[in-house]
């Protein structure tokens, strides 16, 4: 009988979930609003509901969780979460799910899961050392040695959004939310109007304000990625997050920035790629993380 796995990707805005077969095929998938403001206990209840729904329809061998926040991967619990998800810190996914359903469960940080997905079946196949960045409302990072996530001493390696840059930090200067804020302020308009997609569409038409704001973001990304490359020496750098769907526009600009800030001998040995798995990365990565442990 084919073994199936429930895979759940918990983000600040949406929970993506589905069933994945043992060979990595996604058999079914869906999503729901996280309703993060309701807090950790309500998210746990949503996860219970998802698992119970699929237990009625499939023979489930394991539960795979990808989640925002810092994760103790041994205990399978959140040891730090942003205030945007109240009462999420301390959520014991592994303990609660294994106790309730007697099915093995593994939990991993969402950016680490995205990195695993890209390394195993996406943009960084066969990479010896991989650096993965996701750029969205904030900025997250992941380091992989072959197919293994580097967690650091206490499971907080590569929290790159908090890196200090100039008089601020990386995600305060380089995230998509800052791009929208800059354009809206310079145009004396509403931030809601200027989402990433709209900004890039106008930049392609020659809008000077949008072009300048994107170039400023690329400069920040270039400096940060170059500094990370000096420390980690990755073979492949993978960029993900919604804004990175604009790869045709961004890739030459980011490559130029890396050439500016990296020594030529390092730049020529560092490959820049854009994430392939898009919205499925978290679910796939959670599945790969589970399979690595079982």
Where is each model-derived feature located?
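A cytosolic small-molecule/anion-sensing beta-strand core signal
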Residues: 21-22, 67, 145-146
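Glycine-rich phosphate-binding loop of actin/hexokinase-like ATP-binding domains
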Residues: 125-177
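Short loop/edge segments at beta-strand edges and connector loops
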Residues: 107-111
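Short hydrophobic alpha-helix segments
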Residues: 30-32, 82, 153
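Short glycine-rich anion-binding loops that position phosphate/pyrophosphate groups of nucleotides
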Residues: 68-71, 136-138, 243
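A short acidic/small-residue loop/turn micro-motif
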Residues: 34-35, 86, 157-159
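ATP-binding/phosphotransfer module of carbohydrate and carboxylate kinases, centering on a glycine-rich
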Residues: 1-62, 72-77, 99-105, 117-127, ...
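A charged helix-plus-loop insertion that forms the helical arch/lid used to bind
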Residues: 77-90
């Amino acid at each position: 009988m084919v073994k199936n796995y429930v895979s759940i990707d918990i983000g600040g805005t949406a929970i993506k979930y589905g069933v994945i077969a043992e060979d990595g095929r996604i058999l079914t998938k869906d999503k729901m609003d996280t309703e993060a403001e309701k807090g950790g206990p309500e998210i746990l209840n949503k996860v219970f509901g998802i698992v119970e729904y699929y237990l009625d329809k499939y023979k489930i061998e394991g539960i795979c969780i990808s989640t925002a926040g810092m994760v103790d991967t041994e205990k399978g619990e959140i040891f730090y979460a942003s205030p945007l998800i109240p009462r999420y810190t301390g959520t014991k996914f592994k303990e609660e799910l294994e106790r309730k359903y007697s099915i093995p469960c593994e939990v991993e940080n969402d950016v680490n899961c995205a990195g695993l997905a890209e390394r195993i079946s996406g943009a960084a196949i066969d990479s010896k050392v991989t650096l993965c960045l996701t750029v969205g409302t904030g900025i997250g990072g992941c380091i992989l040695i072959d197919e293994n996530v580097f967690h650091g001493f206490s499971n907080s390696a590569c929290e790159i959004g908090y890196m200090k840059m100039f008089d601020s930090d990386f995600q305060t200067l380089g995230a998509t939310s800052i791009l929208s804020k800059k354009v809206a302020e310079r145009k004396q308009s509403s931030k809601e109007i200027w989402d990433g997609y709209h900004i890039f569409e106008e930049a392609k038409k020659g809008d000077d304000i949008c072009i300048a704001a994107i170039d400023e973001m690329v400069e920040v990304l270039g400096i940060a990625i170059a500094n990370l490359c000096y420390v980690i020496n990755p073979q492949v750098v993978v960029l993900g997050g919604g804004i990175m769907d604009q790869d045709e526009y961004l890739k030459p600009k980011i490559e130029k920035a890396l050439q500016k800030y990296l020594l030529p001998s390092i730049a020529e040995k560092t490959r820049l790629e854009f994430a392939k798995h898009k919205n499925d990365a978290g679910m796939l990565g959670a599945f790969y993380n589970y399979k690595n442990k079982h």
